[in-house]
Every structure is written in structure tokens, then in C-alpha cells.
Amino acid sequence: TEGQVRAADIYNRKGRLFAQITYDQTQRPTHTRYFDQNNVVVIMENHLTGDIILTLEGKRHIFKSKQEFVVFYLQYRGYDTDRIIYNSLATPFLVAYALRPKNGRAEDVLFWQESIGEALPGNMKVAMKMPHRNIRIAVQDRQVYEKIQSLATPEEKVYFHNIGYIYDYQRLNNMNPEALILTNSDQLEQIEQLLTQLPNVHFHIGAITEMSGHLMGLNRYPNVSLYPNIRPAKVAELFDRCDLYLDINISDEILNACRTAFENNMLILSFKNTCHSRRFIADDHIYLPENVLAMVEKIQAVLTHTAEMGSALDKQKQAANQASLEQYKAIL
């Protein structure tokens, strides 16, 4: 039929064809063939049945599932499977379940990175009872961990560890009196109050689009710089230069701003109606719009006293559930 895709060729970065997907008349993928460097099919996956056919050393191996295929591969390669780290209770768990350790009892780690329902998943309960594989379950989100603790029995609780995240901080906070705001709207909560109450702070406001006349009108304040159609290089420069990020735009977040500010050790302040990412902002640093003067006082305090800035950044990292290398070494 005209306009329908019947096959798609997949190339690697060097331009070599390594796979081809075929589709039926309803545009549903039916088969994927994987080629070796001689353009010979070595793996064929049937998406309708789940079967995988592998041609290895002149012999055909037929697997009824991806789990069987992965188990065969790990055993064929001779990998040590006495310790498996995985983050899914689907195929990775089923693979671990099927593997028997060579030496005693295996020691696995499951990184649980999903939300949790009103009961522990069935496969999670099975994992805790495997006779041949011991498991520790690392939960990085604190709220998910707390919910799991409310659902688990005393016997199950010992398997769970709240471990948090390791962040790659790009620099230290230098207490520069410069604040960054990135926005694609001209609605910035309490911006004129902030500009007038903080004359010694320079505000850099960037947008990846044109700016409205309302926003361009802020140029009348001496302590503001506007960047319509801001370029990536200028964004990077401002994240490196400013030590405050104000999450105050009444619209969608752009450029992953809160996380980038967090990783640059910038203190992030926001309002309740503009907060885009509570994960990277301490509760104490989220204000009611009518309480803008409290935000002003906070900014003045952290730019005046090193201890105030240090304490505020510590709260921010605690909100983001920061972990240490030592915590990871203990579980890994």
C-alpha cells in the first residue's frame, strides 16, 4: 500500500548495516534480523511469537524468549554471574532467577528506580525468597523508600536500603551576587519586587525565543540583563557565573534548568506556584508569592554570610537525597 513502511534498515555510527526490521500491513514490526560484518543473518527475532533464532558456529539455536537468549549468551561467554546488578523485575530479574551461581549463594543488587503501588510487586517478593541468590534492594527515591517501608513486613524490610544519588557537581558556589532566570514566557512571579528590593544583585534573564515587550521593558532596571534567543554558549557561561537560580517563571521549565543549576552548586529559590522540580529545591526555599520579602531576606543572608550559604546548599543537597561514595561501596 502506498505510504506504508515495509522495512527499515538500521546502521551503526560507521555506516554499516547491522539490522533490518520488517513490518506487516498494519505497520506492526514482525521480525528484526541482525547481520554480521559479512552481511549474514546471525540473529533473527520474531516479534509476534517472541522467538529468537541464533546462528552460532554453524549451528542454529532457538530460544522461546529474550530471557533464554540472554542466559545462553552469559553462559556461552563464561561470565561470572555470582553477582548481578540490575534495575528491572522484568527480563533482567528473570535472567538472574534462571542462573545458578558457581560458588555458593549469589549476591545480587536490585536498583529500584520506579514508583511503587499499594503492594510490593510479586517478582520483588520472589527475589527476596530465592534460595540460590541473595538480594539487596537499593531504593534511590526517599519517598518511594518510605512507602515501601510502610508496605513491607519486618522480615522484608531488611532487604531494602535507601541509598540516594551521587551527583556530578561542576564547581563550587562563590557567592557571586548574580541570579539567573531562564524562561519562555513573560510571566515572572514577583520579578519587579525582586529587582527593586535587591539592587546589589544582578539578574540575568534568558529565553530561547524572542521576548515580549513586557519582558523587554525590564531593561529600565539597572540591575538586569536580558538575553532573547539565548545561545547555548551564553547559557553555559551564565550557569558558570551566577550563584543563584530563581525558578520563578510561570510556564514550563526550559533547558533542564533546575538540575543544571543544582549541579553547578547554585542556590535555587522558587515560589509555590512556579516550582518546577521539588527534587532539587529544599522545602524551606519555596515561598508563597505574597511572602516575596522572605525570599529577598534569604538572598541577602546567603550573599552576606558564608555559613548561611553553606547551610542553604546543604539543605538543597539533602532535599535531592545526595549519597556518598561510601554508601555505594557499602552496598556494592
Language model features by range: what are they?
Residues 213-230:
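Nucleotide-activated donor-binding/catalytic signature segment of Leloir-type glycosyltransferases, i.e.
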Residues 160-217:
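Conserved catalytic-core segment of nucleotide-activated headgroup transferases in glycan assembly
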Residues 304-332:
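A charged, aromatic-enriched C-terminal amphipathic alpha-helix characteristic of glycosyltransferases
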Residues 283-293, 300-306:
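Conserved acidic donor-binding segment of nucleotide-sugar-dependent glycosyltransferases
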Residues 123-126, 131-156, 328:
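A short, active-site helix/loop in glycosyltransferases that binds the activated sugar's phosphate group
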Residues 240-253:
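Acidic donor-binding loop of glycosyltransferase active sites
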Residues 208-209, 227-238:
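Conserved active-site histidine-acidic residue motif and adjacent donor-binding/catalytic loop
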Residues 267-270:
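Short hydrophobic beta-strand element within catalytic cores of glycosyltransferases
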